[in-house]
Amino acid sequence: ISFDPNIRPNLWASRDEICETLQRFLTVTDIALPSYEDESIHWGDSSPNDTLNRFAREGVAEIVVKNGSGAVVAMAGGKIIIRPTPVVLGVCDTSGAGDAFNAGYLASRLLGYNQEQSIVRGQKLGGEVIRHFGARLSKEIFSKGPFKSFT
């Protein structure tokens, strides 16, 4: 089971409800894809490493902490990876960046790529999405270049 908390406070009755529910979800999560920004706001994590460690303590086997333009911090099989996020030129709209990253990462894992390779592919897809308006790429763009291998 993969899980991106993607916390939206206005959908919950209280912060306590958010934290209690998400903590229960982690007990059945195999792959977690949290955003450090969300986690720092709701859990008080002071760094992406804090987020990674908190998810690991809950028993999540594979964790990828997204951090906007900051480095991705990840862990699987006890191995920690810190992967800088490439600079993206021509950013138009950051909507969907995290979802695109997740799609690229999970598709790559399913295709047999290791965790670091999957992070790179997720970063590429997320980076391309933010160069266009809207939260997803058109079929024409997606079916060309480095994204062809996702289809």
Residue ranges and their predicted role:
Residues I1-R54, S69-V72:
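Conserved beta-alpha-beta core of the PfkB/ribokinase-like small-molecule kinase fold
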Residues G44-T151:
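Conserved phosphate-binding/catalytic region of the ribokinase-like
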